[in-house]
């Protein structure tokens, strides 16, 4: 009889633990916390090529060049660590080895995805630039060997709250867990 009570009590403890675990997995984030938007890769069309077909073409495009430099600010050019600059090689180096331009939909908005990496160091130093179709807002994520930098250009309030969420959603769509860049980060 005693063994049966012990088994029943253990069963109740296990059931309570399972219920707590399940509740924790389905609990909404705290109020005021923004959720990452969903992202998907779209077929490449004329919108994706609006500023060029390759990373180099997009960065040299007359409509985008100044916006990209403004996006990264003092981090664009190589230099030594100084006030206001986070990247020693400069963000420009992260796009030297570029790829073809892609089109993503993140949270219902379409973005041109421009990616690149530092030659010879692509597994740990790579970048993703997202240009909202129409060119109004830009987001970027630069992976610097385990440390990630985020950038936003456009409406200040929107950038501060969403740059990381949008850039990370785009990154996860292009490089799902187990991909080359994801393996390098873990």
Residue ranges and their predicted role:
Residues 2-15:
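Bacterial N-terminal signal peptides that target proteins for export
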Residues 26-28:
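Bacterial signal peptide processing site
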Residues 21-24:
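C-terminal motif of bacterial Sec signal peptides marking the signal peptidase cleavage site
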């Amino acid at each position: 009889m005693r063994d049966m009570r012990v088994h029943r009590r253990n069963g109740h403890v296990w059931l309570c633990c399972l219920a707590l675990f399940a509740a924790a997995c389905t609990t909404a984030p705290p109020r005021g916390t923004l959720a990452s938007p969903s992202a998907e890769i779209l077929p490449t069309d004329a919108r994706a090529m609006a500023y060029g077909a390759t990373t180099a073409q997009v960065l040299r495009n007359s409509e985008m060049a100044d916006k990209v430099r403004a996006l990264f600010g003092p981090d664009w050019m190589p230099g030594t660590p100084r006030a206001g600059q986070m990247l020693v090689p400069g963000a420009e180096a992260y796009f030297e080895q570029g790829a073809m331009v892609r089109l993503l939909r993140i949270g219902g908005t379409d973005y041109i995805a421009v990616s690149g990496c530092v030659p010879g160091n692509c597994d740990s130093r790579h970048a993703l630039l997202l240009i909202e179709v129409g060119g109004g807002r830009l987001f970027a994520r630069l992976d610097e060997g385990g440390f990630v930098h985020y950038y936003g250009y456009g409406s200040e309030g929107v950038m501060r709250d969403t740059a990381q969420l949008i850039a990370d959603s785009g990154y996860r769509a292009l490089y799902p867990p187990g991909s080359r860049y994801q393996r390098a980060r873990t």
